[in-house]
UniProtKB/Swiss-Prot annotation:
It comes from the Archaea. Keywords: Toxin-antitoxin system. The keyword Transferase does not apply. This is Putative antitoxin VapB3. Belongs to the UPF0165 family. Coiled coil: none annotated. The keyword Zinc does not apply.
Amino acid sequence: MQIVEAIYEDGVLKLLKNLKLKEHSKVIIKVIDEEEIEKILDSRDY
């Protein structure tokens, strides 16, 4: 499993780093926006 940040721009997700995948690999993408990420991080006890 890989977690990669991306920017949504002009209807396209642009990855901020390359994925280590073979050509034609099928993947499932779960989208978590910045607001939700902040909620998750704020709710954690460190």
